[in-house]
UniProtKB/Swiss-Prot annotation:
<feature type="binding site">
    <location>
        <position position="186"/>
    </location>
    <ligand>
        <name>substrate</name>
    </ligand>
</feature>
<dbReference type="InterPro" id="IPR011912">
    <property type="entry name" value="Heptose_epim"/>
</dbReference>
<feature type="binding site">
    <location>
        <position position="143"/>
    </location>
    <ligand>
        <name>NADP(+)</name>
    </ligand>
</feature>
<feature type="binding site">
    <location>
        <position position="177"/>
    </location>
    <ligand>
        <name>NADP(+)</name>
    </ligand>
</feature>
<keyword id="KW-0119">Carbohydrate metabolism</keyword>
<dbReference type="InterPro" id="IPR001509">
    <property type="entry name" value="Epimerase_deHydtase"/>
</dbReference>
<dbReference type="GO" id="GO:0008712">
    <property type="term" value="F:ADP-glyceromanno-heptose 6-epimerase activity"/>
</dbReference>
<dbReference type="Pfam" id="PF01370">
    <property type="entry name" value="Epimerase"/>
</dbReference>
<feature type="binding site">
    <location>
        <begin position="11"/>
        <end position="12"/>
    </location>
    <ligand>
        <name>NADP(+)</name>
    </ligand>
</feature>
<feature type="binding site">
    <location>
        <begin position="32"/>
        <end position="33"/>
    </location>
    <ligand>
        <name>NADP(+)</name>
    </ligand>
</feature>
<feature type="binding site">
    <location>
        <position position="213"/>
    </location>
    <ligand>
        <name>substrate</name>
    </ligand>
</feature>
<feature type="active site" description="Proton acceptor">
    <location>
        <position position="177"/>
    </location>
</feature>
<keyword id="KW-0413">Isomerase</keyword>
<feature type="binding site">
    <location>
        <begin position="200"/>
        <end position="203"/>
    </location>
    <ligand>
        <name>substrate</name>
    </ligand>
</feature>
<dbReference type="InterPro" id="IPR036291">
    <property type="entry name" value="NAD(P)-bd_dom_sf"/>
</dbReference>
<protein>
    <recommendedName>
        <fullName>ADP-L-glycero-D-manno-heptose-6-epimerase</fullName>
        <ecNumber>5.1.3.20</ecNumber>
    </recommendedName>
</protein>
<feature type="binding site">
    <location>
        <position position="54"/>
    </location>
    <ligand>
        <name>NADP(+)</name>
    </ligand>
</feature>
C-alpha cells in the first residue's frame, strides 16, 4: 500500500522518507512546496514513487486518486517561530492540517503528524495536559489549536491518529532551514568559519552556556514515527524528546571536540575550550529578555506508556554523529 509524506523535502519529512526506504518501503508519495528549490537535495538519495505539490495534494487525496493509502506522515508546515503573518500561519499549519486529517479519517489511513513543544510556551512543565499549554507565538498557537481538534476527534476516530510534540530537533537534512536550523548546525558552521563557537552568557540565574534544552536527534524522531507506524492501534498526542535537558555548553563542546578529532587532535574539557578561546560567551541580548526559555525537558510518561522503550541518543552521541555527517558534506 502507498505511504504519503507531506513536507517530504523538509528536515524531518526527508529523514522519515529515508528511514522508510531503509525498511524497504518505496511506494511513497512525496508532497511538498519546492518554491525553495534547494530542498530537493534532501530527496536525492531517497526512493519515492511520485511527487506532488502541496496545492494539489489534498484535493487528489480526498478524491481517492492514490488508491489504498496505508498512512500519511504529515510533516509539512511553516516552522518559523518568528513568522508574524498569522493569516498565512493558520492557513498553512491549521486549515491545511485539518483537510489532511479529514481525508485520512474518511479513508481509514493512519495519520501521524508533527506537533511541537512550542505549544508549552513559557511553561516549566512539559506534560501533554491542557492546563500547561500556553504558546507564545502564532506558530505555537497554530499547533496548539490543531492539537485541540485532535483531542475532540480521537474518541470517535476509527483509524490511528498520533501527534508528536517535537522538542529541539537536530541532525542531517536541515541545511535549507537557514536561521531556523539547529544550534548544532550553527555551532558547526561558526567554528569552521571563525575557529570558535559563541554562546549566550549568564541569564536568569543560569551560568554562561548553561541554559538547557531537550535536544533530540532526528534519528530518534524518525524511529518514534516508525514505531507508531508499526502499531496502528496506538493513538494520542505524545512528547517527542529525550526526557533529558542538556546545556548549550554540551552542544558546543561536542562540536568542538568532534571537529578536533577529525583533525587528529585530542579532546579538551569545557574549561580548556573556554580558556583557549574555542568557546566564547557573549552578553545576553536585550531583545530576548523575557521571551527566552532557559529550560525544556519532555515528560516521556505517555510515550513510554505507549510501549516505546528504545533509548535516545545523548547530545554527545547524536551531535558527534551529526558533525561527522556534516563534515562529509562539505
Amino acid at each position: 500500500m502507498t505511504v504519503i509524506v507531506t513536507g517530504a523535502a523538509g528536515f524531518i519529512g526527508a529523514n522519515i522518507v529515508k528511514a522508510l526506504n531503509e525498511r524497504g518501503e518505496s511506494r511513497i508519495i512525496a508532497v511538498d512546496n519546492l518554491t525553495r528549490a534547494d530542498k530537493f537535495r534532501n530527496l536525492v538519495d531517497c526512493e519515492i514513487d511520485d511527487y506532488l505539490d502541496k496545492t494539489e495534494f489534498v484535493e487528489r487525496f480526498t478524491r481517492g486518486d492514490f488508491g489504498k493509502v496505508r498512512a500519511v506522515f504529515h510533516e509539512g508546515a511553516c516552522s518559523d517561530t518568528m513568522e508574524t503573518d498569522g493569516r498565512y500561519m493558520m492557513d498553512n499549519n491549521f486549515r491545511y492540517s485539518r483537510a489532511v486529517l479529514d481525508a485520512c479519517l474518511a479513508q481509514g489511513a493512519q495519520f501521524l503528524y508533527a506537533s511541537s513543544a512550542a505549544i508549552y510556551g513559557g511553561s516549566t512543565r512539559f506534560v501533554e495536559e491542557r492546563e500547561v499549554e500556553a504558546p507564545l507565538n502564532v506558530y505555537g498557537y497554530s499547533k496548539f489549536l490543531f492539537d485541540q481538534v485532535i483531542r475532540r476527534v480521537l474518541p470517535s476516530a476509527k483509524s490511528q491518529i498520533a501527534g508528536f510534540r517535537y522538542f529541539n530537533v537536530y541532525g542531517p537534512r536541515e541545511t535549507h532551514k537557514g536561521r531556523m536550523a539547529s544550534v548544532a548546525f550553527h555551532n558547526f558552521n561558526q567554528f569552521r568559519a571563525e575557529g570558535k563557537v559563541k554562546l549566550f552568557g549568564e541569564y536568569n540565574g543560569y551560568a554562561p552556556g548553561e541554559q538547557t534544552r531537550d535536544f533530540v536527534s532526528v534519528e530518534d524522531v524518525a524511529k518514534v514515527n516508525l514505531f507508531f507506524f508499526d502499531h496502528p492501534e496506538k493513538s494520542g498526542i505524545f512528547n517527542l524528546g529525550t526526557g533529558r535537558a542538556q546545556p548549550f555548553n554540551d552542544i558546543a563542546s561536542t562540536v568542538v571536540n568532534t571537529l578536533r578529532a577529525l583533525d587528529n587532535l585530542p579532546p579538551l574539557t569545557l574549561a580548556q575550550q573556554v580558556e583557549q578561546g574555542l568557546i566564547e560567551y557573549v552578553a545576553f541580548p536585550d531583545a530576548l529578555r523575557g521571551k527566552y526559555q532557559c529550560f525544556t525537558q519532555a515528560d516521556q510518561t505517555k510515550l513510554r506508556g505507549a510501549g516505546y522503550d528504545a533509548p535516545f541518543l545523548t547530545v554527545q552521541e547524536g551531535v558527534d554523529r551529526y558533525v561527522r555527517w556534516l563534515s562529509g558534506q562539505v
